[in-house]
Amino acid sequence: MCSDLIPRGVDYTKFRDAIIKWYREFGEKDLPWRKAGDPWAVLVAALLLRKTTVKQVVDIYREFLRRYPSPARLADASVEEIKAIIQPLGMEHVRATLLKKLSEELVRRFNGQIPCDRDALKSLPGVGDYAASEVLLTACGKPEPLLDRNMIRVIERVFGIKSKKRRPHTDRELWNFARSLVPRDPELAKEFNFGVLDFARKVCTAKSPKCSLCPLANNVCVFYQKRERV
């Protein structure tokens, strides 16, 4: 169990507070899907962002929602029409087919509404735990973790833990631990999650992490403390 590997006496509050403070100063607060209150807009972003970059997605995301502001509108579109919009992202046939199926399922099963329930969301085509968490956190006001490889890297380094799963994002213990870190307040939960993701991309990078810029290095991060002792 991941929780058995966590050092005793760790103050999660310091971690949360440091990440939120960092996000308020350095985070990407203007990304449109982070400000979206519409579950459909958040779900679209989650699917468009797969295997591509934020920079590539922003303009396409805005145009996509302008044309298809609801699942019902997208369900009426053809795969070819959808492909024409998202072609610059690559894998356009796969993405378009998936988005079409998703919209049809939402119309058929949920009357065109996006459910604020994890199991219901995960029953939809192309929606896994991460996409479900994005909708629940950003649009439904639920304090869920956005546990992707970036958050996993930060958590494993800071707390000195390591998932035993070959695919850590499927590790239930890791999900439960990540969930315990998220503030209960919905707005703070967003700042914390977005902060961890931006922090992972800008500071706690996969290669050559910028520990000199890390507010967690000296008094929280196990990875840094071990490296300094070498």
Curated annotation (Swiss-Prot):
It comes from the Archaea. Binds 1 [4Fe-4S] cluster. The cluster has a structural role. [4Fe-4S] cluster binds at residues 204, 211, 214, 221. SUPFAM superfamilies: DNA-glycosylase. GO terms for molecular function: 4 iron, 4 sulfur cluster binding; G/T mismatch-specific thymine-DNA glycosylase activity; metal ion binding. Signal peptide: none annotated. Its EC number is 3.2.2.-, 3.2.2.29. Its cofactor is [4Fe-4S] cluster. The keyword Transcription regulation does not apply. GO terms for biological process: base-excision repair. Gene3D superfamilies: Helix-hairpin-Helix base-excision DNA repair enzymes (C-terminal), Hypothetical protein, domain 2. It catalyses: Hydrolyzes mismatched double-stranded DNA and polynucleotides, releasing free thymine. Keywords: DNA damage, DNA repair, Glycosidase, Hydrolase, Iron, Iron-sulfur, Metal-binding. Belongs to the Nth/MutY family. DNA glycosylase that excises thymine from T/G mismatches and uracil from U/G mismatches. Can also process T/GO and U/GO, but not A/G, T/C and U/C. Has weak AP lyase activity. This is Thymine/uracil-DNA glycosylase. The lineage of its organism: Archaea, Thermoproteota, Thermoprotei, Thermoproteales, Thermoproteaceae.
